[in-house]
Amino acid sequence: MNIVLFLGYLSILFAGGAIIAKIAKKIGIPDIPLLLIFGLILSILNVIPKNIVESSFDFIGNFGLIILLFIGSFEMEWNIMKRVLDVIIKLDILALLIVWIISGIVFNFVFHLPILSLIGLLFGAIVSATDPATLIPIFSSMDIDPEVAITLEAESVFNDPLGIVVTLICLSALGLAKAENPILEFFSLAVGGIILGVIAGKFYEIIISKIKFEDYIAPFTLGLAIAFWYFAEGIFPSITGYEISGFMAVAIMGLYIGNVIVHKKEHKKDMEKVAVFMDELSIFIRILIFVLLGASISIPLLEKYALPAFLCALGSILLARPVGVLIATAIPPIRPLTERIYLALEGPRGVVPATLAAMVYTEIMKHPNIVPKNIASLMPPTELAGTILVATFMTIIVSVVLEASWAKPLANILLKRKTSTS
């Protein structure tokens, strides 16, 4: 790759993305839709070649998710979160599974596939993870019950790695990834990731108690998070044949550091440096992921699949999410119905679906022969990759626009009594 051209592309992504994000902030809307559209414009003008976009996602996707999951869990307040922990668990397990299945069924129905085809279920898995972080600026300007806000934010932090786990299982079932036993695979990915995350947090605490990193604490923290991710995704599978979710491990590590080590006086300054560094880095990553997702979509692809993709998006947003949340939160102890409805209507998709869709699209387009013949007979590999990419793009942009628009009016209607007394 020509290094001069590569740096030129980066300048367009960062400078252009920053301007777009600033415009979004100025007019009071989430930056995701505008960043996606900016990427789409770059695609139309062929500013950045498709092969550069596609080859970038493997690195940017994995590296970006490590940073975003770490900082998201690092900033979670356990004292508030534990008051709604039962709701978070219901949303992150039962609701996520229901959203996955229903979104997949809708996709299969729209594209005339067998109702339980793994192709649709792969789409459902990709869009099952939420990203209410896009609503934080809106929540900050609202008189909203902090328990509702923390529920949505914590749900996202922990269903992000679970969404990745479910996607990996679907890829395994499709023959696009290796798995000996899907049930055991889920257990080793999710539970193994949690255990490894706690070990990582404890190990980090021991190291920084013995060595004063001072100005180098932030790169050490990032390096150790990546090291544990690598152990989970690379070393452990080569030894045992089973994977641990490195993303889950990173999220739990961040939660431990942000709620245990942060409160220790001797580490307070170091943790402030870590928070600032990760926050700044996450801005770069968000810009890259959303602009590159938009840039990966060609106009012919969008024209061909826009309408069915829009229907898939509506099915996931207005059917799968509400049904999943209302069923999951019907398990006692039951929260007020108005609060449950609000949670059901606020689950915008974001970074994780964007990254997963782009990575799946890139892998299939590079190696179409990896798609098994029984799957390719239902939908050709290039069409499979294209439909999932465009449907995910549409789900992200529609969910963010709709749910950011109605977040405040719905809160005034559904949560009025609770917020007025809090």
Curated annotation (Swiss-Prot):
The keyword Oxidoreductase does not apply. The chain crosses the membrane at residues 3-23, 28-48, 52-72, 93-113, 119-139, 157-177, 183-203, 216-236, 242-262, 281-301, 307-327, 341-361, 384-404. The keyword Glycoprotein does not apply. GO terms for cellular component: plasma membrane. It is a multi-pass membrane protein. Its main location: membrane. It is found in: Cell membrane. GO terms for biological process: intracellular potassium ion homeostasis; sodium ion transport. Keywords: Antiport, Cell membrane, Ion transport, Membrane, Sodium, Sodium transport, Transmembrane, Transmembrane helix, Transport. InterPro entries: Cation/H_exchanger_TM, Na+/solute_symporter_sf. GO terms for molecular function: potassium:proton antiporter activity. This is probably a Na(+)/H(+) antiporter. Belongs to the monovalent cation:proton antiporter 1 (CPA1) transporter (TC 2.A.36) family. This is Probable Na(+)/H(+) antiporter 2. It comes from Methanocaldococcus jannaschii (strain ATCC 43067 / DSM 2661 / JAL-1 / JCM 10045 / NBRC 100440) (Methanococcus jannaschii).
